[in-house]
């Protein structure tokens, strides 16, 4: 199996449409941060409401994923500081001030560049059918971001390939050199321009990509409510990683039917517990605490779906850690696991599924 075969897409088009196995076509939009944590309570409520409406836009036929990428920046910083020199006696001061600004920028993010993306996909028979539908979704997504006050930018094919190249070459200072004219001239495919020198998935809990070590984990959510601080704390770490939230909306009728079925099952369990209590001479109104909690949570969820126009989502939360040494990798994974544990979640390694997770 070659490194190119590990990269799962089938084709990338110049306009940013990517074809995946199973007839799924995707596009990606890069977006920036919004000052949520430092906003007032009223503003936080408004932002949260807007974000909820944004997520509710996606129906069951439109899977999407949120990607948060922390990568180590090198000499080519995305923040360019340049104070032009003048014909006077103050150029040494300008040089000193420029150096100070560059140092402050490096310290503020610990040399880590943090990027955020949303990728959405639709099933289609071909690119001609997929392209106009994806363009409509892209316009809606960017319109929703604009209403939230979040700057966003669609990614074309070269930008998506450059992003994949940076993911496939951690720690490398090599620039991404690619032009669509290179394809017919060289006979190479787009994967040949982004594939790493080597990928090694022979170990069960780690993998090698070039000279770097990597590990893929997933988040086991055991909390009844997931704190908005969990993701923020993970992304603030001084570590190279990719956090991905794969989200699939459940059809509304199916979701309501599923919850009603669960409530019916809980009702049967209540009756059975009450029968046991009567036979044993206990008060039948005293039920196990877990059963009471499950019943209350299910009723609240059904109310959200039926009367508050909320949606049910299936979520897969994965974390890909990358590090130059195995010890640093294990330390980074341990730190992420500690943050997850603080919010009543567990970080589980994908044993023998590192390639699929990556």
Annotated model-derived regions:
Residues 1-358:
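Extended, folded cores of ATP/NTP-driven motor/assembly subunits in large transport
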């Amino acid at each position: 199996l070659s490194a190119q075969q590990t990269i799962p897409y089938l084709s990338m088009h110049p306009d940013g449409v990517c074809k995946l196995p199973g007839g799924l076509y995707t596009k990606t939009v890069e977006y920036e941060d919004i000052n949520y944590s430092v906003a007032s309570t009223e503003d936080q409520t408004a932002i949260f409401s807007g974000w909820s409406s944004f997520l509710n836009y996606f129906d069951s036929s439109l899977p999407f994923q949120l990607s948060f990428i922390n990568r180590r920046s090198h000499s080519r910083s995305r923040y360019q500081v340049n104070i032009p020199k003048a014909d006077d006696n103050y150029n040494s001061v300008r040089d000193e001030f420029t150096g100070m600004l560059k140092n402050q920028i490096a310290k503020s993010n610990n040399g880590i560049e943090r990027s955020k993306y949303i990728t959405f996909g639709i099933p289609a028979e071909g690119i001609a059918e997929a392209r106009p539908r994806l363009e409509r979704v892209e316009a809606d997504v960017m319109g929703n971001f604009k209403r939230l006050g979040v700057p966003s930018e669609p990614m074309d094919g070269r930008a998506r390939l450059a992003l994949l190249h940076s993911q496939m070459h951690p720690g490398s200072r090599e620039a991404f050199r690619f032009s669509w004219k290179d394809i017919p001239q060289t006979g190479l495919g787009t994967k040949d321009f982004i594939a790493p020198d080597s990928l090694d998935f022979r170990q069960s809990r780690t993998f090698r990509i070039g000279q770097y070590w990597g590990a893929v984990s997933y988040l086991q959510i055991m909390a009844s409510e997931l704190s908005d601080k969990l993701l923020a704390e993970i992304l603030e770490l001084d570590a190279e990683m990719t956090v991905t939230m794969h989200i699939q909306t459940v059809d509304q009728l199916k979701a309501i039917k599923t919850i009603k079925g669960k409530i019916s099952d809980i009702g049967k369990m209540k009756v059975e517990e009450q029968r046991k209590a009567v036979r044993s001479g206990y008060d039948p109104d005293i039920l196990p605490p877990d059963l009471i909690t499950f019943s209350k949570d299910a009723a609240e969820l059904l109310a959200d779906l039926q009367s508050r126009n909320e949606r049910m989502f299936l979520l897969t939360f994965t974390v890909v850690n990358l590090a130059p040494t195995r010890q640093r990798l294990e330390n980074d994974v341990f730190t992420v696991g500690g943050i997850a544990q603080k919010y009543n979640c567990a970080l589980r390694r994908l044993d023998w599924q590192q390639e699929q997770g990556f």
